[in-house]
Amino acid sequence: FVNQHLCGSHLVEALYLVCGERGFFYTPKAGIVEQCCAGVCSLYQLENYCN
């Protein structure tokens, strides 16, 4: 997994992959869209959004 742009459904799919059964907490206020779609994010950064 390399740092990459993740937007829309790709971002959601990546969160499901990373978080698995834990699920994830998604809110635009958290900045995940700015971080991962406008910029790039890593696997480690995605894990911050897991429950």
Curated annotation (Swiss-Prot):
Keywords: Carbohydrate metabolism, Disulfide bond, Glucose metabolism, Hormone, Secreted. One of its GO terms (biological process) is glucose metabolic process. It is found in: Secreted. The keyword Chloroplast does not apply. SMART domains: IlGF. GO terms for molecular function: hormone activity. SUPFAM superfamilies: Insulin-like (SSF56994). The keyword Disulfide bond applies. CDD domains: IlGF_insulin_like (cd04367). It comes from the Eukaryota. Coiled coil: none annotated. InterPro entries: Insulin, Insulin-like, Insulin-like_sf, Insulin_CS, Insulin_family. Gene3D superfamilies: Insulin-like. One of its GO terms (cellular component) is extracellular space. Disulfide bonds join 7-37, 19-50, 36-41. Insulin decreases blood glucose concentration. It increases cell permeability to monosaccharides, amino acids and fatty acids. It accelerates glycolysis, the pentose phosphate cycle, and glycogen synthesis in liver. Belongs to the insulin family. Heterodimer of a B chain and an A chain linked by two disulfide bonds. PANTHER family: INSULIN, INSULIN/INSULIN GROWTH FACTOR. This is Insulin. The gene is INS.
